[in-house]
Amino acid sequence: MNIVRHRGIVYCDADFIISHRGEAIKDVVGRYPVLCCYNDVCYDPEREGVYDESNIHELRTIKLNDLDINRYPITRGLLFLTNQIVNAWM
């Protein structure tokens, strides 16, 4: 995910947002917004508005096809072990 900070506002190019339960959600107008959250404040470049609703802390941004290793501890562990083996071998 590309994140650009400009005058305290965070922009990103995430394809959709997911809740803490993992399902994709839509914003109030029924589309998947381009939205970026930082310190519980979310910015939507298309609507040019800042959002800090009470439930915004449950949201975070991910790209549609990216592997988010922070959500998958097993994958994170396997990547760590693979890196350790490669580093030891080199």
From Swiss-Prot:
It comes from the Viruses. This is Uncharacterized 10.5 kDa protein. It comes from Thermoproteus tenax virus 1 (strain KRA1).
